[in-house]
């Protein structure tokens, strides 16, 4: 949690860090990823059989090696919009017997050469946990139950035996399952009303938890601020002893929200993720309101928020139907850093956050047949995943603010937009880690820092301009490591992310 005092442009900014004031434990799942059958995310991204850079499974070794440095705890699969017409059974068994199907989300052909077993094997090689989305478009409850049985079944039953026949004796124990994806959207096959979705989601959840009570089920929300979010929460967050429930455990464990931000202008781009902060706050209140109105007892586990699609994405410059391959700038990297600061500040309410997507599609990591490129947005992800874990701690920022245009415009009425964006963490190793984004395009900001002690390790991400990119054959944006003695004010460079690290 970071509190804020607004200063004039003439005042000296300050940051006060309080390591003894722990706010909440950070769920490492806020550094989760997402892989969809879209563009080159799967085919030519994580899976490229026949390429000299791939292993015996067809998995790109350079991609795996890079992703391992991010220590990604969970990866969502296989969609996304793709999920509304995907049938998992098409993607298991002998590859020469798998049918190719028309793909209606991105208007292509799905070969099904990469499916459930391949993805779960890839997760094991990467060292991450899978998160599956169920087909709420053309899919059925029987199909969903069969998929869970295939992945998790231990008995002498048809789909558990089919898994064994396909070469996997032990269950995969897939824990996270989403009840559809963006079913409210007009772009979806089988778009639903909030009334129809809520009824269907609750009934599916009952059946799924009867089959496997250990599942973590994620309700499909909108952006956290919509009537859809309130209605679905109100009708699905019921007491365990409700007459509508047949489960001894809560049916809904998380509520999903999605948001993408972007602007062609730097400052609206860099401040746009503050919309996500307000969305998290509103969603958290809606969860509490639904529980209060439905008489859910306080001892029943409270659902957390699953922000399972987020990123900087301009769908005009990176069209989804054309693969959504963004060329990210330093401005975008700073926006991603603000996104991550938001997640650290709001860790109390977050159970997961999945950047969309992991490879090639609006991604920090791009592939060619010959290798990989780490985009500008890679570096904030790397620093946060490595250092911003443990406990969110109290911090106070005093700073002047940016007073110009915001995107979306409503940010201006509900959030302050300081020149410095800050979050602070106390790691399990006893180190304080403070992430500071200076969004100012022209000015370094000299800041007093109360709480720093001893030698401070400094990691800085910046470039010559906010338009700097790593996609022109050279790395214009990277991490530079240095030290600071912790004495006097610290000057945060213009248009930069700085991570300060010292022993508490």
From Swiss-Prot:
Its main location: secreted. It is found in: Secreted. GO terms for cellular component: extracellular region. Its EC number is 3.2.1.55. It holds the Pfam family Alpha-L-AF_C. It catalyses: Hydrolysis of terminal non-reducing alpha-L-arabinofuranoside residues in alpha-L-arabinosides. GO terms for molecular function: alpha-L-arabinofuranosidase activity. InterPro entries: Alpha-L-AF_C, Glyco_hydro_b, Glycoside_hydrolase_SF. Glycans are attached at residues 152, 181, 269. Pathway: Glycan metabolism; L-arabinan degradation. GO terms for biological process: arabinan catabolic process; L-arabinose metabolic process. The keyword Cell division does not apply. The keyword Oxidoreductase does not apply. Keywords: Carbohydrate metabolism, Glycoprotein, Glycosidase, Hydrolase, Polysaccharide degradation, Secreted, Signal. Belongs to the glycosyl hydrolase 51 family. Alpha-L-arabinofuranosidase involved in the degradation of arabinoxylan, a major component of plant hemicellulose. Acts only on small linear 1,5-alpha-linked L-arabinofuranosyl oligosaccharides. This is Probable alpha-L-arabinofuranosidase C.
């Amino acid at each position: 949690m970071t509190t804020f005092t607004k200063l004039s442009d003439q005042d000296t900014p300050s940051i006060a860090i309080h390591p003894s004031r722990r706010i909440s434990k950070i769920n490492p799942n806020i550094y989760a990823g997402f892989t969809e059958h879209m563009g080159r995310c799967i085919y030519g991204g994580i899976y490229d059989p026949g390429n000299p850079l791939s292993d015996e499974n067809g998995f790109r070794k350079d991609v795996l090696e890079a992703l391992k440095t991010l220590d990604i705890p969970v990866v969502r699969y296989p969609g996304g919009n793709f999920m509304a017409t995907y049938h998992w059974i098409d993607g298991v068994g002998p590859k020469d017997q798998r049918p190719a199907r028309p793909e209606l989300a991105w208007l292509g052909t799905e070969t099904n050469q990469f499916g459930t077993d391949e993805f779960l094997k890839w997760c094991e090689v990467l060292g991450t946990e899978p998160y599956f989305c169920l087909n709420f478009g053309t899919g059925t409850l029987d199909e969903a139950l069969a998929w869970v049985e295939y992945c998790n079944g231990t008995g002498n039953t048809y789909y558990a035996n089919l898994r064994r026949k396909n070469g996997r004796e032990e269950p995969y124990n897939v824990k996270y399952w989403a009840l559809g994806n963006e079913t409210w959207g007009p772009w979806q096959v089988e778009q639903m009303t909030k009334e129809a979705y809520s009824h269907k989601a609750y009934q599916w959840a009952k059946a799924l938890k009867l089959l496997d009570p250990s599942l973590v089920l994620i309700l499909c929300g909108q952006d956290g601020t919509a009537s859809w979010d309130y209605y679905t929460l109100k009708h699905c967050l019921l007491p365990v002893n409700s007459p509508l429930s047949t489960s001894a455990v809560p049916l809904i464990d998380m509520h999903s929200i999605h948001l993408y931000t972007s602007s062609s202008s730097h400052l609206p781009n860099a401040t746009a993720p503050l919309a996500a902060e307000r969305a998290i706050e509103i969603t958290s209140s809606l969860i509490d309101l639904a529980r209060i109105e439905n008489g859910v007892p306080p001892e029943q586990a409270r659902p957390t928020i699953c922000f399972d699609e987020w990123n900087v994405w301009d769908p005009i410059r990176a069209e989804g139907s054309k693969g959504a391959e963004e060329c990210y700038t330093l401005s975008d990297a700073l926006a991603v850093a603000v996104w991550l600061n938001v997640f650290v500040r709001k860790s109390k309410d977050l159970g997961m956050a999945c950047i969309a997507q992991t490879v090639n599609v609006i991604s920090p990591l791009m592939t060619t047949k010959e290798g990989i490129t780490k985009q500008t947005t890679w570096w904030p992800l790397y620093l946060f995943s490595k250092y911003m874990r443990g406990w969110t701690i109290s911090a106070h920022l005093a700073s002047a603010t940016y007073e110009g245009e915001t995107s979306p415009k409503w940010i201006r009425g509900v959030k302050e937009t300081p020149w410095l964006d800050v979050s602070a963490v106390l790691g399990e190793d006893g180190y304080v880690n403070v992430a500071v984004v200076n969004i100012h395009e022209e000015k370094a900001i000299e800041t007093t820092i109360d709480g720093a002690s001893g030698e401070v390790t400094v990691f800085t991400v910046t470039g010559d301009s906010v338009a700097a990119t790593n996609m022109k054959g050279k790395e214009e944006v990277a991490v530079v490591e240095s030290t600071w003695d912790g004495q006097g004010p610290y000057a945060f460079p213009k248009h930069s992310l700085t991570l300060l690290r010292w022993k508490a």
